[in-house]
Amino acid sequence: MGSSEDVIERQATMSIIYGERVRLRAVEREDVNKFHEWVNDPEVTRGLALYLPMSFLDEENWFNLLAKRDPREKPLAIEVNKGKNWKLIGNCGVFDLDSVNRSAELGIMIGDKSEWNKGYGAEVMSLLVKHCFETLNLNRAFLKVYTENIRAVRSYEKAGFVLEGRL
């Protein structure tokens, strides 16, 4: 059996989900400025179900409501490894979790356009799917995507998603 220090270290490691090049961590108040910038960029939100413009107060209210959400449905900040530092590039999460049918919807926004087309979306979605099945014990993870969002469709297919239907 490990020491209490081992337990503390293990808990700290589990609070962040690490991939090869990305990590998913809790959203912090200082992230709100970047999120506000991204959700008001029509190029970033083109494939998302967001409506422009969004005030900074709206974004702060969104952040303040996170404390009341089911911990399993809190969004995660996406960061990429840049040597000795981590760079915030977007957010993702699990939502509309159905405990009876053990399913949930996934969502992602890579807001930093300088980090587009580098495969981070597929890596993030793979981590989220693994988290859904191994940690949350779900049977099904799904998402919705606009058919014209080709970059996202490719990313989701790389992560193992298959087309079930079109609306």
What function would you assign to each model-found segment?
Residues 86, 119, 149:
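Conserved G/P- and acidic residue-centered "switch" motifs that form tight phosphate/ATP-binding loops
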Residues 134-144:
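Conserved GNAT acetyl-CoA-binding A-motif
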Residues 117-131, 153-158:
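Conserved acetyl-CoA-binding loop-helix of GNAT-fold acetyltransferases
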Residues 2-114:
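GNAT-family acyltransferases
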Residues 113, 143-153:
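Conserved beta-strand-loop-alpha-helix junction that forms the acyl-donor binding cleft
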Residues 142-145, 162-167:
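Conserved catalytic-core motifs of GNAT/GCN5-like acyltransferases
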Residues 27, 131-133, 161:
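Conserved hydrophobic/aromatic "anchor" residues
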Residues 34, 105, 123, 140, ...:
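Amphipathic alpha-helical recognition patches that constitute DNA-binding helices
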